[in-house]
């Protein structure tokens, strides 16, 4: 480790201990050498004893800076790793940092646009940032070519070295977790860190975010439910993104929404519809739908429309995952726990040798109490969370796409119930899920599949005779190969039998010759001939097997 890394590591450990986070380590794991080392190098007391453990962890991560703040935000979605009182505190982490100088942002923009002055492309460029976060910050301007208002998102110029340095240390700390925590190996800390690193590096590439926003906008073109601002790809690069500036009410500002006469029930239900449409119709969903990224249009408050921004994190499900997920939801709310267990095995989410009866009983034990509440009070996200936590006890592999989905569903539910506390998520979602499943297995699905495959089949049709001929030839060759292998095996079997017989005779001759040589020396050359015969017989047997 370099001196700089050692200083940073010392600061990280110092911060953790000053917030008393050594409480996370069971006392039995704090050995005498570890206690001596802690006293010698880190003698500071816990200065925040009045705060609960979850709050102390949140404050420590905030003190360590943006990389750790975003790491804590990601961990808040992994409720299989932490109890609720810690996960809830991590969810409160705010990705707010001091903005960097507007002149630096201007230099970044000019560099991304080929070194030309910013005035070449934009009018009314604001040096003061509109918003600032750990990865990037946003400035306003107008496009010179058409006068449209835009926002320019610029990556922080100094962020990559900071991320690389801190990620190195996070990996080192992750390697210590299995040694310090009794359940550390099951938590797979290095996999968690790898997942976080991928998410973080994806956010550093604004071309990826631009592509995500363009795709999402296309999916909801002319939709009354969701509006995605237009991206101007000609101005986008890895370090800069330009998109239409929008005006709306933050979805968390309930008072402002009510003041303009927004239909709150319809708005809440549309949030659910947007989520399930993204997941099941489009297989492409915005996976960072926290309140800071969602606005509501000022227009048509009686027919409200969401506005979505910041598409840096997206998720997708394949066709099989979508089907299993939809059937899981319906089976869950029908209390058909046997089907839930079987679906998990069929999908490959849990190992194929899982005892279905035990799995069904575990799901029933954990989830049956949930359904004692009225359906309107049941949290979809927490149902999914309980299901995944139970499945992990049966060695369910972590599915990154399902973790993203669960996090997004919790956001959608939280926002929906904040807008309209009586929101019945199940009543809103069930018709959509049932219709989707019916659409996947009915005649329309067969017609669609035929239409999708027909061009491929038509293209391949002239090749069918040749393919049939090749198949027959391969079948003949395979049969010849099988016959040869069977014949060789028979010959080998016969030779092995002969070898065993010869080895037996050779052993008898050697033993007889040896005994006669010891006990009947008067027999002269006979013992020697017997031993020589035994050796020769062994050699013949060995040749048979080689």
Curated annotation (Swiss-Prot):
| Pfam families linked | ABC1
Which InterPro entries does the entry mention? ABC1_dom, Kinase-like_dom_sf, UbiB, UbiB_bact, UbiB_kinase
Residues noted as binding ATP in the record, renumbered to the chain? 130-138, 153
Where does it reside?
Cell inner membrane
> What keywords sit in the KW lines?
ATP-binding, Cell inner membrane, Cell membrane, Kinase, Membrane, Nucleotide-binding, Transferase, Transmembrane, Transmembrane helix, Ubiquinone biosynthesis
- What does the record give as EC number? 2.7.-.-
One GO MF term on file is: ATP binding
CDD domains, from UniProt? UbiB (cd13972)
Please list the coiled coil stretches.
Answer: none
GO cellular component assignments: plasma membrane
Transmembrane segments annotated in the record for this chain? 501-521, 522-542
Q: Which residues form the Protein kinase domain?
A: 124-502
Q: Which SUPFAM superfamilies match?
A: Protein kinase-like (PK-like) (SSF56112)
Q: Hey, which pathway is this one from?
A: Cofactor biosynthesis; ubiquinone biosynthesis [regulation]
| Similarity field | Belongs to the ABC1 family. UbiB subfamily.
What is the protein name for this chain? Probable protein kinase UbiB
Native source species: Klebsiella pneumoniae subsp. pneumoniae (strain ATCC 700721 / MGH 78578)
């Amino acid at each position: 480790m370099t001196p700089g890394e050692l200083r940073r590591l010392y600061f990280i450990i110092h911060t953790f201990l000053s917030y008393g986070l050594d409480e996370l380590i069971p006392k039995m794991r704090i050995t005498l050498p570890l206690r001596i080392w802690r006293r010698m190098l880190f003698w500071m007391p816990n200065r925040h004893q009045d705060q609960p453990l979850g709050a102390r962890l949140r404050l420590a991560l905030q003190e360590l800076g943006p990389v750790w703040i975003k790491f804590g935000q990601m961990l808040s979605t992994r409720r299989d790793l932490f109890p609720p009182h810690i996960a809830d505190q991590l969810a409160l982490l705010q990705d707010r940092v001091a903005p960097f100088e507007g002149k630096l942002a201007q230099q970044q923009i000019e560099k991304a646009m080929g070194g030309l002055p910013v005035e070449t492309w934009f009018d009314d460029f604001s040096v003061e940032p509109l918003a600032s976060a750990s990865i990037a910050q946003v400035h306003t301007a107008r496009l010179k070519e058409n006068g449209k208002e835009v926002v320019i998102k610029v990556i922080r110029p100094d962020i990559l070295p900071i991320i690389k340095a801190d990620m190195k240390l996070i990996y080192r700390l992750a390697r210590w977790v299995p040694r310090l925590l009794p359940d550390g190996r099951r938590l797979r800390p290095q996999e968690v860190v790898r997942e976080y690193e991928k998410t973080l590096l994806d956010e550093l590439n604004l071309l990826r975010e631009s592509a995500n926003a363009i795709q999402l906008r296309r999916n909801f073109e002319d939709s009354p439910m969701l509006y995605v601002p237009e991206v101007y790809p000609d101005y986008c690069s890895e370090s800069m993104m330009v998109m239409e500036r929008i005006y709306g009410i933050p979805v968390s500002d309930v008072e402002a929404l009510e003041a303009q006469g927004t239909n709150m029930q319809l708005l809440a239900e549309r949030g659910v519809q947007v989520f399930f449409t993204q997941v099941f119709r489009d297989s492409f969903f915005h996976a960072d739908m926290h309140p800071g990224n969602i606005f509501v249009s000022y227009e048509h408050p009686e027919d409200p429309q969401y506005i979505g921004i910041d598409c840096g994190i997206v998720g997708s499900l394949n066709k099989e995952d979508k089907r299993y997920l939809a059937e899981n939801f319906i089976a869950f709310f029908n209390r058909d726990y046997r089907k839930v267990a079987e679906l998990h095995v069929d999908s490959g989410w849990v190992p194929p040798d899982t005892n279905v009866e035990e799995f069904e009983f575990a799901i029933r034990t954990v989830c049956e109490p949930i359904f004692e509440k009225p359906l309107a009070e049941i949290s979809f996200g927490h149902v999914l969370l309980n299901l995944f936590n139970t499945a992990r006890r049966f060695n369910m592999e972590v599915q990154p796409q399902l973790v993203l989905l669960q996090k997004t569903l919790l956001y959608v539910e939280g926002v929906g119930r904040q807008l309209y506390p009586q929101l019945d998520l199940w009543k809103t979602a069930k018709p959509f899920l049932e219709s989707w499943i019916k659409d996947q297995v009915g005649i329309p699905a067969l017609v669609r599949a035929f239409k999708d495959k027909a061009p491929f089949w038509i293209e391949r049709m002239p090749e069918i005779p040749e393919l049939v001929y090749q198949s027959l030839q391969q079948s003949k060759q395979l049969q010849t190969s099988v016959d040869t292998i069977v014949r060789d095996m028979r010959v080998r079997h016969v030779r092995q039998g002969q070898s065993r017989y010869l080895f037996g005779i050779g052993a008898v001759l050697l033993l007889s010759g040896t005994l006669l040589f010891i006990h009947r020396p008067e027999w002269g050359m006979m013992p020697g001939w017997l031993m020589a015969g035994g050796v020769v017989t062994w050699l013949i047997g060995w040749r048979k097997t080689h």
